[in-house]
Design a protein with these regions (language model features):
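Structural motif corresponding to the early beta-alpha repeats
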Residues: 72-80, 86-95
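N-terminal beta1-alpha1-beta2 module of alpha/beta enzyme domains
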Residues: 3-81
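A short, compositionally biased domain-edge/stem linker segment
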Residues: 1-2, 173
Length: 174
């Protein structure tokens, strides 16, 4: 990924962390040593064996999609192995996540990495994966919006609650 901050172009790498790929801590350390600005990792909670959703890249689903690590756990390892490298989700599948747990994971990773976390989000492409999480794919954008609003409240307020169509929780500390 490339992005511009002010007048400076920054360069990052995208990685599918799996149990048979390069160790994420070693990769992060190597990227930082070579002057990269960031490391982004994907998210899939699971890939249903029987799918209605075709792979967006066409053809067969690559093996790496079948065995991805949790992005927050993987990025925690990368954070521990580096000092300056920014760490990001590319993307975090918000419709499939509990907003309270996700808000806690995001805040914890950002704090423990000294503010190096980049939270990139999306709705996803795999209809079957969404449905397994109880999400109607046609409403995923509405679900994303509401969950993000709930998480923003948890990050901004000492005692935050939320009441909506998809998210409901009483004022809580998080």
């Amino acid at each position: 990924p490339l992005w511009i901050t002010g007048t400076v172009m920054q360069v990052g790498a995208f990685h599918f962390p799996t149990d048979y790929g390069i160790d994420i801590a070693e990769l992060a350390h190597a990227l930082e040593a070579r002057g990269f600005d960031a490391l982004f990792v994907c998210e899939h909670t699971h890939i249903p064996v029987s799918r209605k959703s075709p792979f967006p890249g066409g053809g067969e689903l690559p093996k790496k999609y079948k065995h991805t690590h949790d992005p927050f756990v993987a990025l925690s390892f990368a954070a521990a192995a580096t000092r300056k490298l920014k760490l990001g989700t590319g993307i975090c599948l918000i419709p499939q996540r509990d907003p309270i747990v996700t808000a806690k994971s995001v805040a914890s990773l950002d704090q423990l990495s000294n503010g190096r976390f980049i939270f990139a989000i999306g709705g996803g492409w795999n209809v079957d994966e969404m449905e397994h999480h109880g999400v109607d794919p046609s409403r995923r954008r509405d679900v994303v919006r509401e969950k993000v609003l709930a998480m923003r409240g948890l990050w901004a307020e000492d005692e935050a609650g939320y009441s909506g169509d998809f998210v409901e929780f009483a004022p809580s500390w998080s």
